[in-house]
């Protein structure tokens, strides 16, 4: 039986995108609590600093780095900084995402389509493209993509969000096969309704929805899995139907 450790991620570096609030903040705090140095990426420096303070107050380590995942040069700059400062990238959590749930597809403005796809899909591609080489060189690493059950089901008035998450699931499965020979694990989490500002939860009981911490616990489970195996996909649902 594998011995449990209080700090199983001690010495590891975890990059979390969209770490300023909601699911991303919860994931960053969870990984820091397990001993990882967390690199907090996002566009809102104030929110990132708030997450960093929560981590520091709990005895963890965090570094705030401004990053726009839709801008390749911005992501590459963060990867270069991580390599310079730490020399490694053990965990990459692609969490940054936006939604659009206000109209059917035929009424959706083209710029709304572009914004969602650029963040939810192109941004993940940019991050994997920038950080995977470090993992390949180290022959070790774990990439966790935060998708959605909307990437498994139809979502009326949310077609672009659903399409971006279906695409993210396909990307995740393919990259998992591409990187397995390099000893790199790729997992995708598909949560149901999570009580965050992104989720369209009007009329739903928050007590019956997933909380950001629920997703964070799953990330922790994945990245502390014994190295000879990995969980490729997790479908996460609230126990009680909202």
Where in the sequence are the language-model features?
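Conserved glycine-rich cofactor-binding loop
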Residues: 13, 20-22
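Active-site helix of classical SDR
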Residues: 128, 164
């Amino acid at each position: 039986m594998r011995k449990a450790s209080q700090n199983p991620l001690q010495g590891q570096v975890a990059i979390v995108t969209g770490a300023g609030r909601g699911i991303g903040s919860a994931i960053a705090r969870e990984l820091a609590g397990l001993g990882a140095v967390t690199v907090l990426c996002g566009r809102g420096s104030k929110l990132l600093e708030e997450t960093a303070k929560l981590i520091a107050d709990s005895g963890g380590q965090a570094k705030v780095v401004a990053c726009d995942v839709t801008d390749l040069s911005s992501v590459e700059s963060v990867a270069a900084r991580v390599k310079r400062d730490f020399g490694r990238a053990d965990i990459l959590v692609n969490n940054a995402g936006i939604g659009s749930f206000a109209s059917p597809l035929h009424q959706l403005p083209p710029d709304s389509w572009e914004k969602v796809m650029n963040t939810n899909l192109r941004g993940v591609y940019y991050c994997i493209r920038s950080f995977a080489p470090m993992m390949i060189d180290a022959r070790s690493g774990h990439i966790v993509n935060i998708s959605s059950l909307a990437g498994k089901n139809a979502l009326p008035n949310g077609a672009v969000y659903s399409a971006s998450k279906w695409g993210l699931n396909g990307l995740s499965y393919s990259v998992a096969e591409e990187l397995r020979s390099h000893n790199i694990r790729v997992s995708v989490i598909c949560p149901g309704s999570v009580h965050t500002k992104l989720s369209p939860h009007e009329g739903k009981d928050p007590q019956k929805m997933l909380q950001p911490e629920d997703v964070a616990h799953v990330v922790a489970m994945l990245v502390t899995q014994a190295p000879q195996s990995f969980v490729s996909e997790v479908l996460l649902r609230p126990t009680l139907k909202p």
